[in-house]
Amino acid sequence: MSRTESTPTLLDPQLSDEKWLGKLDWRKGAPASLVGASRKGNIDGFAAALKEQNSLSAKRQLKLTELLQGLHLNDSHNGILVRTFLGLTSSTADDLESELTQALELHGLNPAPPLEVIAGLTFLLVAPNRLSQATHVSLWRWCVVQCCHWIEEQPTEGEPETLSDLLSVAELPLLAGQMFPHLKQSKKWISKGRKGWNQWCTETTDSDGTLDAQWLDRMLPVLQSLGRSETYLQDASESLLSAKLTGSMEGLVKRCLCLATPGRLATLSSASSGTLTEFKSALAALGYKKTHPIRRLLALYADPQSRGQRLGVRTWDLPEQFHQSDWAEWACLRTSWDADLDQVLVNYGDAQTVLDIVLNGLSVFSGSWTSQLQLDGVPWEPSEWSCSCVFHDDDADYVELQQVDDDKGVTITRQILLNRANRGLFLADIIKTNQPGELSYRWELPFSSDVIPNAGSQNGHPHAAEPRFEFDALTREAAAQFEDLRVRLFPLGWPQDRFAPAPGKMQLDRQGLAMEVRVTGDGLCLPLFLDWHPPRRDTPCDWSLLTVAEDGQVIDRSQALGSRLRLGREQWLYFYNIRPGALPRTVLGHHTLYETVIARVKRGGEIVPLVQVDQEQVE
């Protein structure tokens, strides 16, 4: 019987289990006990033959159960079969029978989510002796029907777009091929599963292993699925991890390690991310030993007392900290792998940038960095972001993004600089238009759920203490106090004096941070400096807008903006040429043709650039 003839018959819900068994098509060499019981429609004999084929000892079944349980997210959205499997070791025989019967009645023979099918197959692998003969055969039939549906009848075409798509083309065929080796339909299932994994890695990772930003929120479930797939094959003395797939997987893990910080695993989305412990378990299943530097780092981060401590493993044993991929559309700016790290993750694959900002090991901001621009009162529709400039050295990590609308003559430039040497973060938005008019602009950045109580931390952290927001009475400085972390904010594009005129304002409340500005002209620059370095938490500060000159003529601030910030004995310069001139411009005694200069100012007045940017290059 051909595939096209036999598969629809197996999917017929009108057949009883006895008649259905008689319709099975077996490969040559299938065990006589299975074939004989099947052709006779003998439920008890078929169940007994199935158990004979499972060679796992009770001890091995228990060990495999515990291993596979650690490779599932403990998620409230799990289906009934996944939940039942996660509670398998503590359930009684009666409870298990009842829950499986309920699950099979709930799903029927309609297509079930691939993860539910995988859980059903796992019961057949690790718990056949705990099932009654009737339930064993019913579950076996249900799994065969589901596998035929997903693998043969409605296979996912093209690149998988969802986790369910990936499970149906990769893990499910691998496990199904192992569990049903004697069925004719399963002949190529294992090879299909191997091909599915290889194709997914090729299509969703950059050449260095950077994962497509659209998959970041599913990074851990993907690694768990890969770990389960490897576990199934290892139990059959095989391996999924070819040299090519191993290389892709190792690159992915290195690039995604930045998602791990003390006590949490980021996703750059609102999706549940899983835990550091689940991340460690996935790596263990993929061959990462307990002594591997990455697993040691995750163990450090999982310690509730680790945040703010400098207890990391050796830097040269870990991946490079900074990375950015135009193809994957995200970047990581990071100071170190220590537990007191500072980090900015940037996902710019859509019209709104997504940020995840960790300061001194604490997640402070997380979510969409939204922006709204109005031109003469008319809202401007944002375009997609692209990365126009990146820079990295021992002193600073820098990423520059742009939105360009040629039709409306609008360019928005977004700058992010993480000061690695002296700590501190520069954020700046610059708007340029072809025609002068009224520009109204506002951006918002939400706080992380880890620092706002009652927001519901996605990783199950205890609720944070209520933050305190401070606004200086005489200046425009503001601060947010999160338990032992104080973040100071300096709007460098406006005068320090609160009573001096300014074209905008800064807002700070439980919802997050926002800045808005309204000017008349064809450009504006909105820089902000954030400081949280503990030695500077109460240091006196001052900042001032600087005079910018070209060939002895003062340049209006709508054409170029310069600002100097002083915190104690440390000083920084921020300069941006909104409309570059024909000659070098002078700011704080520094002559430059560059569009952007962000620099440290030494005590003697010497300018030491952290980054210099023009439209063509970075130095």
Locate each region found by the language model:
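Short Pro-Gly-centered flexible turn/kink motifs
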Residues: 518-532
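Beta-strand-rich interaction surfaces with strong enrichment in secreted/lumenal proteins
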Residues: 416, 514-518
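Catalytic and substrate-binding regions of extracellular carbohydrate-active enzymes
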Residues: 288-483, 522-526, 555, 601-619
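Eukaryotic intrinsically disordered, low-complexity regulatory regions
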Residues: 498-505, 526-529
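Ser/Thr/Asn(+Pro)-rich, low-complexity disordered segments
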Residues: 1-112, 343-347, 352-368, 379-380, ...
